[in-house]
């Protein structure tokens, strides 16, 4: 669980996009390419933002189930 996971996923999305660029169906090829590649890139961006925000939260979570004398 680190930044390398994001890099590895990015490289796999780039590889899948390159494969689909070559193997796209011949009729409406431009539509297929742009639809699939844009969909994969936007899903990667949403996943990466969510994953990285969970790794490095802006607000530190607090436990609410502690007794007051043990709470900080």
From Swiss-Prot:
Q: Which residues form the signal peptide?
A: none
Its protein name is V-type proton ATPase subunit e
The listed locations are: Vacuole membrane
Q: What family does the entry list?
A: Belongs to the V-ATPase e1/e2 subunit family.
- Single GO term (MF): proton-transporting ATPase activity, rotational mechanism
Q: Which UniProt keywords apply?
A: Hydrogen ion transport, Ion transport, Membrane, Transmembrane, Transmembrane helix, Transport, Vacuole
Q: Could you tell me which species this protein originates from?
A: Eremothecium gossypii (strain ATCC 10895 / CBS 109.51 / FGSC 9923 / NRRL Y-1056)
Annotated function: Subunit of the V0 complex of vacuolar(H+)-ATPase (V-ATPase), a multisubunit enzyme composed of a peripheral complex (V1) that hydrolyzes ATP and a membrane integral complex (V0) that translocates protons. V-ATPase is responsible for acidifying and maintaining the pH of intracellular compartments.
How does the annotation summarize its subunit structure? V-ATPase is a heteromultimeric enzyme composed of a peripheral catalytic V1 complex (components A to H) attached to an integral membrane V0 proton pore complex (components: a, c, c', c'', d, e, f and VOA1).
| Alphabetical GO biological process terms | transmembrane transport; vacuolar acidification
What lineage does UniProt assign to this protein's organism?
A: Eukaryota, Fungi, Dikarya, Ascomycota, Saccharomycotina
Q: This protein's superkingdom?
A: Eukaryota
State which residue ranges cross the membrane.
3-23, 35-55
């Amino acid at each position: 669980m680190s930044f390398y996971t994001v890099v590895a996923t990015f490289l796999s999305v780039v590889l899948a996009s390159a494969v689909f660029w070559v193997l796209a169906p011949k009729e409406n090829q431009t539509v297929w390419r742009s639809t699939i590649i844009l969909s994969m890139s936007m899903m990667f961006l949403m996943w990466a933002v969510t994953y990285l925000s969970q790794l490095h939260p802006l607000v530190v979570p607090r436990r609410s189930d502690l007794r007051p004398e043990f709470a900080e």
